[in-house]
Amino acid sequence: MLHIYNTLSRTKEPFKPAHAGQVRMYVCGMTVYDYCHLGHARMLVAFDVVQRWLRASGLAVDYVRNITDIDDKIIRRAVETGRRIGEVTEYYIAAMHADERALGVQPPDREPRATQYVGEMLDIIGRLESKGLAYRAEDGDVNYAVRGFADYGKLSGKSLDDLRAGERVAVGSAKRDPLDFVLWKSAKPQEPDDTKWESPYGLGRPGWHIECSAMSKTLLGLPLDIHGGGPDLKFPHHENEIAQTEGAFGGALANVWMHCGPLMVDADKMSKSLGNFRTIRQTIAQGPLSDTQAEYAVNPREAEMLRFFIVRNHYRSPQNYAPDNLVDAQNALDRLYQALQNTAADGQGVDWSEEPQAQAFKAAMDDDFNSSGAVAALFELASEANRTGSARAVGQLKALGAVLGLLQQDPPAYFQSPTRYSAAARGQGAPAAALDAAAIEARIAERAAAKAARDFARADAIRAELRAAGIELDDKPGGLTQWRRA
């Protein structure tokens, strides 16, 4: 049976959807004002693995992941670049989708945009106001009265007294309490017209937290079976969501809360605010990038390496980014593909009941989506395939890899893609990229001719030349030679 660590209860619990066989899952998505970085990649891949395993377990999943398309950061980007809000958001939504496709992230069943649900947000604000949980401030904003919600802090484990001790009301603030947060922001004269909506409170726009309360309730109803997001959303965003939704409607917002761990860089979380981020496209693009093109050419070997780098780590554990860690991930993924290349698969599906590695894979995934343990089962199968040449083991390896969104490329084509993350490339300036496929095939043909002429010294010299350039040859029965980049 599947068990999930619930941030709310701080324990691992048996997962029981509110409606048998059906899962309503909401994940907080991107604020689209810039390119996605590797920390975003971790969240996207982590919850992609979650929804894949839920479906593989026979559950019907309604997966909603929102887009925040109105926000202070978006407004700043539009003003800085002289573009309309919609131009900014459409471009970065397209860029995000390109990143997701590159990483093998399946699209959510529904992907609502905040600006499509302003009416529903105003309805919730009205409910909160009628219950004394929201008030109109002197500056025209509508704020949530945190003091009126007794359970505030239950998700993050923070008490109101502790929170208030670290807060001060800013000079000129219209808040009654320093912890109160904005539900509706009054329009400012200097802000673009396409950031303003009519409301009972005058022209303005929604606060960030109210957006997810409206979209999750409208599309999935209450309670959600799973609500997820990145590590920095637990507080205040998800805490505020609970206060809004439960304050307005009563009952639980979500039965299970999931948060993936942070991606770390030198002991700090990767984030745009710290300036220590690397974008997804910088990491896996094939060729130059343009700031005017949302789409880009993807190196499929490097893209799968990045997904593998994320999947091999448990989603809740902090993960460290360093170039050498990507090299290690590339080498490990190459070993799995080498096993696939050495032996043809039998084409059979996964036998969960008979195969020990499949059972180990399932046990790991049922234990809070432990993809790290599942990857260990893949290496057991690869080891068996290399040791015995078992077509069954290779078939299981490919089928189980598919559950994690891995190992679906054609092995010869995979190895023919250059990579910046091999040990040779890191140490010698990517020599493997110096020869293109046509040049490599020509050298292989020369070697074959030398072997046919029994000039084995020449054949060995060509192999050595290619190896020095980062190209490994694999001679197969019947005179066929396959190649791969080291």
UniProtKB/Swiss-Prot annotation:
Enzyme class: ligase
Superkingdom to which the source organism belongs: Bacteria
Principal subcellular localization: cytoplasm
A GO term, aspect molecular function: zinc ion binding
Motif 'HIGH' region per record, residues: 30-40
Gene Ontology CC annotations of this record: cytosol
Transmembrane residue ranges: none
Cofactor(s) in the UniProt record: Zn(2+)
Cofactor note: Binds 1 zinc ion per subunit.
Binding annotation for Zn(2+): 28, 212, 237, 241
GO biological process, one term: cysteinyl-tRNA aminoacylation
Subcellular location: Cytoplasm
EC number: 6.1.1.16
Keyword Transferase included in the entry's annotation: no
Family annotation (InterPro entries): Cys-tRNA-ligase, Cys-tRNA-synt_Ia_DALR, Cys-tRNA/MSH_ligase, Rossmann-like_a/b/a_fold, tRNA-synt_1_cat_dom, tRNAsynth_Ia_anticodon-bd
CDD domains with a match to the protein in the record: CysRS_core
Keywords assigned by UniProt, alphabetized: Aminoacyl-tRNA synthetase, ATP-binding, Cytoplasm, Ligase, Metal-binding, Nucleotide-binding, Protein biosynthesis, Zinc
Catalysed reactions, as listed in the record: tRNA(Cys) + L-cysteine + ATP = L-cysteinyl-tRNA(Cys) + AMP + diphosphate
Motif ('KMSKS' region): 269-273
Binding-site residues for ATP, renumbered to this chain: 272
Protein family per UniProt: Belongs to the class-I aminoacyl-tRNA synthetase family.
Quaternary structure annotation from Swiss-Prot or TrEMBL: Monomer.
HAMAP family for this protein: Cys_tRNA_synth (MF_00041)
Official protein name in the record: Cysteine--tRNA ligase
Gene source species: Bordetella pertussis (strain Tohama I / ATCC BAA-589 / NCTC 13251)
Lineage of producing organism: Bacteria, Pseudomonadati, Pseudomonadota, Betaproteobacteria, Burkholderiales
